[in-house]
Amino acid sequence: MTLSPSAHVDTFTRDALPPAHLWPTLEFTIPDVQYPERLNAAVELLDRTIDRFGADRPAILLADGTSWSYRELRARVDQFAQVLTEDLGLVPGNRVLLRMLNGPWTVVCWLGALKAGMVVVTTMVAWRARELRPIAERV
């Protein structure tokens, strides 16, 4: 298998892949399971859903009755992606460690980082320093 060109400026993830002979064989022969040469999961999950079903449908519903539409979610996601790239200077391929409780802002940060081309590394908030250290050192 040959890797297609990447949009990542930071090539850490590609450089850290195991040798090619250890890669799995991926065969996409089913017509319904075809993927484009380049795919951004956040664009597919958020923007394509809006394209298909509209921006005013509920995207996030909370137990307290609060809800965000896809339009509101996308605005927050795009703003977070902009902060990562324009304010913090991150580039596609940089790793972003998320350590948050599950909630709507976790979704915003995860999708925003993906949309900006980052590699998202999520960790559990219950982990202590000794458990986080080896991960943070690699991120």
Identify the meaning behind each predicted range.
Residues 1-40:
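Flexible, non-catalytic linker and terminal segments flanking ANL/adenylate-forming cores
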